[in-house]
Structure formats: C-alpha cells, structure tokens
C-alpha cells in the first residue's frame, strides 16, 4: 500500500512540478535561467540533465563557458517553458540586457530600464501621497497615472546594481537537480518494490529493505532542495 501511495504521489509531484516550472518561466524567467545555468538564451533550448558548472565563471559579463561538462535533452527547456519545442527562452545575459522579442511579441526591457521605471514609480507614490495630503486633486490624479504605468516595476526601484537580480546560479542549479534526481529515484524505487512484492520476494530481499530504509532521509533532502530553488531563486 505504501509503495502504491508513494508511486502515485511521486508521479503527481512531477506533474505539478511541470506546471510550476511553466509558471516560473512565465513569471520568474531569471529563476529559470539560474536553474539551468543558462546565460545566453535562444530558440529550441535544451534542458540540462547532468552538468558541472564552471567555477571560473564569476560574472554574467565574463566570457567563460558556463559549464565544464553537461548533457542536455534537446529542445526540452523550450517545451517546458513555452510548450513549444522551438520557442525562445532568454538567458541571464538576455534578461539583464533586454532588447529581445518575447514570445508575446513585445520587446523586453533591460534591467536598467526596469530599475528606472521602478524609481519613477517610487517617486510617483511619494508625490501622490503628498498631493493627497495637500488636497491637490489634479496633481494627485497625474501622479496616480504615472504610478500605475510604472507600478509593475516598483520593486526594481530598490535595486542598485543589475547583478543583484541574478540568483546564486550554483546553488539554484544544483538544488534543482538534486530535487529532480531524487524524484526520479523514488519512482524507480516504488516500481521495483511493487514488482518484488507481486513476486512475493520482498520479505526475503534484504538489500531492497535497506534501500527503502536509507531512502527515508532523501525525501526530506528533496523537499529542502525544492525550497532552496523556490526561495533562493525568487524574483
């Protein structure tokens, strides 16, 4: 019963995880780029299955390769992000510099432009509050329009350096892979357990019992890795 429950739960988690990854791509593209160690985006981008980040790469501005070694599933990241194998997925550099055409047909703003709009929104809010306090309705209406136009970038107004917008790539990248690899491991473990149980061998298979026992902490590790990805990469 526990193996059946574990298998169903693991499959559901992967299914909901796919939906979460899609939402990340839509709402927090910088997190997705950090999860994949993706500095330069493009069309038909592959998903890194296994990879070792290059420790010599310390800035998005340097010319170092992002990886020492990596194996990718062709075009899978584009499908994960946009449900289109050939869709464009921006990388860290693209998100900072802007200027690319999004899949919605709009031109992406640069980080500096977003920061300026954020500062404009912050100032407009202060001016609006002052105008309301002074009962200057005309000025208040004007400042409110400015605030509403720039409000989507309000938080950017507190950013001093565009590099602050980049999550810790190494921590996010490896945590994501720990979570995914353990999730796949659990599915395999539960399938093997069910097969052995159906054959009536599980009671006498000590190694499988030990693997099941030793796997208990891995569930907590997978959960914590997921939280690291969620919080460290938050935008």
Per-region residue spans from a language model:
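Juxtamembrane interface at the cytosolic side of transmembrane helices
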Residues: 1, 181-222
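Hydrophobic alpha-helical membrane-insertion segments
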Residues: 5-13, 132, 213-233
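Aromatic-rich transmembrane-lumenal/periplasmic boundary elements in polytopic membrane proteins
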Residues: 5-119
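Transmembrane helix-loop junctions and nearby membrane-interface residues
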Residues: 11-21, 191-201, 224-230
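Membrane-interface interhelical connector segments
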Residues: 92-93, 97, 110-113, 121-133, ...
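Membrane-proximal extracellular juxtamembrane segment immediately upstream
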Residues: 140-171, 175, 182, 217-235
């Amino acid at each position: 019963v526990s193996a059946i429950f574990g298998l169903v739960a693991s499959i559901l988690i992967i299914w909901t995880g796919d939906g979460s990854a899609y939402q990340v791509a839509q709402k927090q593209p910088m997190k997705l780029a950090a999860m994949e160690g993706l500095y330069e985006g493009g069309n038909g981008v592959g998903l890194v299955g296994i990879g070792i980040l290059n420790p010599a790469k310390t800035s998005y501005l340097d010319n170092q390769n992002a990886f020492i070694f990596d194996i990718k599933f062709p075009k899978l990241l584009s499908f994960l992000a946009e449900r289109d194998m050939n869709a464009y997925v921006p990388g860290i550099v693209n998100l900072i510099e802007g200027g690319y055409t999004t899949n919605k047909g709009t031109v992406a703003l640069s980080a500096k432009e977003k920061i300026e709009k954020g500062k404009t929104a912050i100032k407009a809010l202060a001016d609006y509050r002052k105008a309301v306090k002074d009962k200057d309705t005309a000025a208040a209406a004007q400042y409110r329009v400015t605030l509403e136009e720039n409000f989507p970038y309000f938080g950017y107004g507190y950013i001093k350096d565009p590099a602050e917008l980049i999550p810790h790539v190494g921590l996010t990248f490896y945590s994501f892979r720990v979570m995914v690899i353990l999730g796949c491991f659990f599915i395999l473990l539960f399938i093997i357990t069910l097969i052995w149980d159906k054959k009536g061998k599980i009671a006498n298979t000590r190694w499988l019992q030990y693997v099941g026992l030793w796997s208990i902490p891995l569930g907590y590790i997978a959960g914590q890795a997921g939280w690291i990805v969620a919080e460290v990469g938050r935008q």
